Amino acid sequence: MVKVIASSVRKGNVLDVDGKLYVVLTAQNFHPGKGTPVTQVDMRRIVDGVKVSERWRTTEQVERAFVEDVNFQYLYEDGEGFHFMNPANYDQVVVSQETMGDQKAYLQEGMTCILSIHEGIPLALELPRHVTLEIVETEPVVKGQTASSSYKPAMLSNGIRTSVPPHIDAGTRVVIATEDNSYVERAKD
């Protein structure tokens, strides 16, 4: 276990709070005009999946559990969960639906992800920062819109909605940021 200050806690970190392991879902630092800055952390207890919320002063010490981050390749999904393979030694692990959360929409066969493993158990998954997806539906362009500041809604091939520039049409492959579902650029393939 490593002690770190609360303000350095990030999404995906594994914390040891009162002898129980938690995966950080969100971590935000608040600096009110009056009073001490605090870090608001939403976490999921690994043992039973219960979500909890904690608030610490930013200078408070919290314990981070030792977690190994390993590259794994996504294989497939079945009733058991999501199957990943370590390309270095061909070991396979199954990640549960709860651990995967809403990130499953971005999984593509053969995609390399980083799994956080603690004592042989996959705790959290980190997707690549950007993925390439196809636009399946967009609204038509309204004449007179400027290309600089206006975006139009679009539906991606994985079912997620995003906003794209007016020149992007259905069938176009685009690069999307996995963290906030935002448009990055037109795919270069």
UniProtKB/Swiss-Prot annotation:
<keyword id="KW-0251">Elongation factor</keyword>
<comment type="function">
    <text>Involved in peptide bond synthesis. Stimulates efficient translation and peptide-bond synthesis on native or reconstituted 70S ribosomes in vitro. Probably functions indirectly by altering the affinity of the ribosome for aminoacyl-tRNA, thus increasing their reactivity as acceptors for peptidyl transferase.</text>
</comment>
<dbReference type="Pfam" id="PF09285">
    <property type="entry name" value="Elong-fact-P_C"/>
</dbReference>
<dbReference type="InterPro" id="IPR020599">
    <property type="entry name" value="Transl_elong_fac_P/YeiP"/>
</dbReference>
<keyword id="KW-0963">Cytoplasm</keyword>
<comment type="pathway">
    <text>Protein biosynthesis; polypeptide chain elongation.</text>
</comment>
<dbReference type="GO" id="GO:0005737">
    <property type="term" value="C:cytoplasm"/>
</dbReference>
<dbReference type="InterPro" id="IPR001059">
    <property type="entry name" value="Transl_elong_P/YeiP_cen"/>
</dbReference>
<dbReference type="InterPro" id="IPR014722">
    <property type="entry name" value="Rib_uL2_dom2"/>
</dbReference>
<dbReference type="InterPro" id="IPR011768">
    <property type="entry name" value="Transl_elongation_fac_P"/>
</dbReference>
<dbReference type="GO" id="GO:0043043">
    <property type="term" value="P:peptide biosynthetic process"/>
</dbReference>
<dbReference type="InterPro" id="IPR008991">
    <property type="entry name" value="Translation_prot_SH3-like_sf"/>
</dbReference>
<comment type="similarity">
    <text>Belongs to the elongation factor P family.</text>
</comment>
<keyword id="KW-0648">Protein biosynthesis</keyword>
<dbReference type="InterPro" id="IPR013185">
    <property type="entry name" value="Transl_elong_KOW-like"/>
</dbReference>
<dbReference type="InterPro" id="IPR015365">
    <property type="entry name" value="Elong-fact-P_C"/>
</dbReference>
<dbReference type="GO" id="GO:0003746">
    <property type="term" value="F:translation elongation factor activity"/>
</dbReference>
<dbReference type="Pfam" id="PF08207">
    <property type="entry name" value="EFP_N"/>
</dbReference>
<dbReference type="InterPro" id="IPR013852">
    <property type="entry name" value="Transl_elong_P/YeiP_CS"/>
</dbReference>
<dbReference type="InterPro" id="IPR012340">
    <property type="entry name" value="NA-bd_OB-fold"/>
</dbReference>
<protein>
    <recommendedName>
        <fullName>Elongation factor P</fullName>
    </recommendedName>
</protein>
<dbReference type="Pfam" id="PF01132">
    <property type="entry name" value="EFP"/>
</dbReference>
